[in-house]
A protein has these predicted regions:
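Short coil/turn linker and secondary-structure boundary residues
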Residues: 99, 120, 142, 212-215
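Active-site-adjacent structural segments surrounding the nucleophilic cysteine of cysteine proteases
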Residues: 1-123, 163-165, 170-173, 196, ...
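Noncatalytic regulatory segments and standalone regulatory/sensor domains
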Residues: 29-34, 43, 167, 173-178, ...
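Secondary-structure boundary/capping residues
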Residues: 95-96, 138, 156, 200
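Predominantly the structural core of cysteine protease catalytic domains
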Residues: 115-188, 192-194, 234
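Residues that form generic nucleotide/phosphate-binding pockets
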Residues: 107-111, 128, 132, 150, ...
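Extracytoplasmic/secreted envelope proteins and their assembly/folding machinery
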Residues: 75, 79-87, 105, 122-126, ...
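Sequence-level motif detector for i,i+2 pairs with an aromatic at +2
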Residues: 57, 154, 237-238
């Protein structure tokens, strides 16, 4: 079968992203500016837009959690990779491109040194980002409206899942050791957008080609629930983390 075409155009900052993937319809994504988190008041600037865009895509740069290919030594660095992606986006890298592997690896090593444990709860991920990277954070219920609201505020979402729960057959052991301990593991990734078909876009650092993976809302919720059932020490329920500058 011939390869299907992909056409995309993006405007940096607040703008519009036109995308055509395969034989489906063209999707027109908007790219909102980042709205700071107001920690002292529910200021209007921190409230979700009244009219949500039908589709949002944030051009968050990507790195796998093993940017130099050393996966055996990078089994527990999904938190770091997720933070690297979001941190670079908040600091102005709206390229949506692959981060230089050596730059990403050095940043992952730095965040590893800051981690209080090998595997972190979502609250601990926020605390690491706040203490060491200077970002305000909020833990938000992972329902459709809240996810779309936060993305429409220009904030990527960091989500805790279990890998096989994502339904992505590219994960090791998906077809041979489905949902078995040691194969389907706790994991963090970044949600960068949504469209009118209730599809969400992921930057998944657990795969070398995890950039721009599309997943249904129900499948994403299943992956979150799967984490909570298999890893009760990380159980926070259906929630996600957002980072942004504080005002």
């Amino acid at each position: 079968m011939a390869a299907l075409g992909v056409v995309a155009m993006i405007a940096i900052g607040a703008g519009i992203y036109f995308a055509f993937f395969g034989a489906g319809p063209q999707v027109t994504y908007v790219t909102p500016d980042i709205v700071p988190i107001n920690l002292s008041t529910t200021a209007p600037s921190d409230q979700p837009p009244v009219d949500l865009p039908s589709a949002v895509l944030l051009p968050v740069p990507f790195t796998p959690q093993a940017p130099l290919g050393n996966w055996a030594a990078r089994q527990h660095t999904c938190e770091e990779a997720s933070l690297v992606m979001v941190d670079r986006y908040l600091r102005g890298d709206h390229s949506g491109a692959l981060i230089d592997p050596h730059t990403a690896d050095a940043a992952i090593n730095q965040i590893t040194a800051w981690k209080p444990a090998v595997d972190l709860t979502i609250e601990q991920v926020g605390e690491v980002a706040n203490k060491n990277l200077g970002w305000a954070y909020q833990v938000v219920p992972a329902d459709r409206l809240s996810m779309k609201q936060q993305l429409a505020l220009g904030r990527p979402l960091i989500v805790g899942v279990r890998t096989h729960g994502l339904g992505n057959p590219n994960y090791p052991g998906y077809s041979t050791h489905f949902e078995q301990p040691g194969w389907s593991v706790s994991h963090y990734l970044v949600v960068t957008g949504y469209d009118q078909a209730d599809t969400y876009v992921l930057n998944d650092p657990g795969l070398t080609r995890g950039h721009g993976y599309h997943i249904s809302f129900d499948q994403l919720m299943h992956a979150i629930d799967d984490l909570d059932q298999a890893y009760p020490n990380l159980n926070a329920g259906r929630v996600f983390l957002v980072l942004a500058p504080a005002v």
